[in-house]
Amino acid sequence: MNNLDISFNDEVNFLKNDDKDWIPWITNLLLSAKKEINKKNAQEMSINFVSSEKIHEINKKYRGKDRPTDVISFAIEDGLDEDFMAAFNDDPDFVEDIGDLFLCPEVIKRHSVEYETGFNREFGYTLVHGYLHLNGFDHIEDDEAKVMFGIQGKVLREYGLPLHPDQENHGKQIH
């Protein structure tokens, strides 16, 4: 259940930070999220750290939004039938490729200042949020949002990164 293989692509030298060893921090946080959603099979994914310009371009091309954002998730299994995937998930040797996250540390930092959450909390929030999207969670409908933000909040609290009060009470992003 603990196997999560993450490949990193760091176009902005985020991981070269002398103050923090981000790779184990990221891995442990995502393993906590994996455990919370009861994913038993091994998973693999990529995390790409990109500039504000690059994520703006991706956001415009794939989401039709002409602005930079903090995270974009490209789920491999998006739209696949749950019964189809269940056949694979029953195989203990199956490694599930869940997709790719694109994170923009510059936007995350700006959000952390704007929302007064601190960088680590905002980064953790964004990371878990993207990971849950890769695993099929969404927040378009209120009932979906309640489930997704409930999981997200629990994982972050247990990791020492509590949600902003607005997120706790309403299950919505403050972004």
UniProtKB/Swiss-Prot annotation:
PROSITE patterns named among the record's database cross-references: UPF0054
An annotated GO BP: rRNA processing
Signal peptide (from-to): none
Keywords for the protein's UniProt record, in alphabetical order: Cytoplasm, Endonuclease, Hydrolase, Metal-binding, Nuclease, Ribosome biogenesis, rRNA processing, Zinc
Coiled-coil regions listed in the entry: none
EC number: 3.1.-.-
Cofactor dependency: Zn(2+)
Location of the protein in the cell: Cytoplasm
Family membership noted in the UniProt record: Belongs to the endoribonuclease YbeY family.
Protein name: Endoribonuclease YbeY
Organism of this sequence: Lactobacillus gasseri (strain ATCC 33323 / DSM 20243 / BCRC 14619 / CIP 102991 / JCM 1131 / KCTC 3163 / NCIMB 11718 / NCTC 13722 / AM63)
Upper lineage: Bacteria, Bacillati, Bacillota, Bacilli, Lactobacillales
